[in-house]
């Protein structure tokens, strides 16, 4: 990875982590104040990768966010021989470097959607950006879905009018449970292997994707912060969370990439919900 590219992308992911954690802690504070509770805070844990690099896992378990994790990492080394053929540009020597941020939020309220987001920059003998964000409501609402998609469409349209329809389609295709023949949530955008030939433009786009998430998801959470919910709704949420687990363990590229590169297991599996039911 080019040193300057590595530094500026890694610094951005760290900055975005701080912005997201600050906003989520603020939401916890807003809720706690009305209930005379002590607001939850993120707990950070650093980890080192044996083959090179490491990361920081930020985890919060609160009254609003039952479990929310924000991970940043910068790792480098060599892919195992059996994994090299799956990664563009790694076929010859297997060398790679990757930096990125990943976020998964599971809310206590079954009325507030779960959310997944990540962006990353990877170099082998080639280089590219990837990432996106998607929403998983248990009780979908059309206006909420439209608002989420509109935020990402605005970010996409600044760069290419073809980005949003392309990345939306890729998201719908990627977050699909083939064995159940059903989607995981209401989508968003998903892009990978993005290299337009203009690093600055691709990096700027990836930054705007992060800011789009920061602008829209906290608004969705706040809109339902104090809505009452029933035991039946909670039960349904726990059952539907099972689909989330199935996808992440069977299909998720990030999970596979992390495990195949000897990443931190706790950080990799942070995406799993804290409580789930299988019927």
From Swiss-Prot:
* Marked site positions, Important for dimerization: 179
Q: Which domain of life is it from?
A: Bacteria
One GO cellular component, as annotated:
cytoplasm
Q: Which Pfam families match?
A: Coprogen_oxidas
Q: What is its main location?
A: cytoplasm
Instruction: Enumerate the residue ranges of region (Important for dimerization).
Output: 244-279
Q: Does the keyword Metal-binding apply?
A: yes
Task: Enumerate the cofactors the protein uses.
Answer: a divalent metal cation
Instruction: Name the residues annotated as catalytic in the UniProt entry.
Output: 116 (proton donor)
**In which pathway is this protein known to take part?**
Porphyrin-containing compound metabolism; protoporphyrin-IX biosynthesis; protoporphyrinogen-IX from coproporphyrinogen-III (O2 route): step 1/1
The disulfides recorded in the entry are none
Q: Keywords assigned by UniProt?
A: Cytoplasm, Heme biosynthesis, Metal-binding, Oxidoreductase, Porphyrin biosynthesis
Residue positions annotated to bind substrate are: 102, 118-120
Q: List the subcellular locations.
A: Cytoplasm
Q: Which GO molecular function terms does the record list?
A: coproporphyrinogen oxidase activity; metal ion binding; protein homodimerization activity
Q: What is this enzyme's catalytic activity, as reactions? A: coproporphyrinogen III + O2 + 2 H(+) = protoporphyrinogen IX + 2 CO2 + 2 H2O
Residues noted as binding a divalent metal cation in the record, renumbered to the chain: 106, 116, 149, 179
Q: Give yes or no: UniProt keyword Aminoacyl-tRNA synthetase.
A: no
Write the Enzyme Commission number(s) for this entry.
1.3.3.3
GO biological process, any:
protoporphyrinogen IX biosynthetic process
The protein's enzyme class: oxidoreductase
Q: Which family does it belong to?
A: Belongs to the aerobic coproporphyrinogen-III oxidase family.
Q: What does this protein do?
A: Involved in the heme biosynthesis. Catalyzes the aerobic oxidative decarboxylation of propionate groups of rings A and B of coproporphyrinogen-III to yield the vinyl groups in protoporphyrinogen-IX.
Quaternary organization: Homodimer.
State the name under which the record lists this protein. Answer: Oxygen-dependent coproporphyrinogen-III oxidase
Query: What gene name is given for the protein in this entry?
Result: hemF
């Amino acid at each position: 990875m080019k040193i300057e590219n590595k530094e500026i992308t890694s610094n951005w992911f760290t900055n975005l982590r701080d912005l997201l954690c600050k906003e989520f802690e603020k939401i916890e504070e807003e809720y706690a104040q009305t209930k005379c509770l002590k607001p939850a805070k993120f707990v950070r844990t650093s980890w080192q990768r044996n083959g090179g690099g490491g990361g920081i896992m930020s985890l919060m378990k609160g009254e609003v966010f039952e479990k929310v994790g924000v991970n940043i990492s910068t790792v480098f080394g060599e892919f195992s021989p059996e994994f090299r053929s799956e990664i563009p540009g790694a076929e010859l020597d297997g060398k790679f470097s990757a930096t990125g941020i990943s976020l998964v939020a599971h809310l206590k309220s079954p009325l507030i959607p779960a959310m997944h987001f990540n962006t990353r920059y990877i170099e082998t003998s080639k280089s590219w950006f990837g990432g996106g964000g998607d929403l998983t409501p248990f009780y979908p609402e059309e206006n909420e879905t439209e608002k989420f998609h509109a935020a990402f469409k605005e970010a996409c349209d600044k760069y290419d009018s073809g980005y949003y329809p392309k990345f939306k389609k890729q998201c719908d295709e990627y977050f699909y449970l083939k064995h159940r023949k059903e989607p995981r949530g209401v989508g968003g955008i998903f892009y990978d292997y993005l290299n337009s030939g203009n690093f600055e433009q691709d990096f700027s786009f990836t930054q705007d994707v992060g800011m789009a998430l920061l602008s829209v998801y906290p608004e969705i959470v706040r809109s339902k912060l104090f809505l009452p919910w029933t035991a039946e709704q909670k039960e349904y949420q726990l059952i539907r969370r099972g689909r989330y687990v199935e996808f992440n363990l069977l299909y998720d590229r990030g999970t596979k990439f992390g495990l195949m590169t000897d990443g931190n297991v706790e950080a990799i599996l942070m995406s799993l919900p804290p409580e789930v039911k299988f019927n």
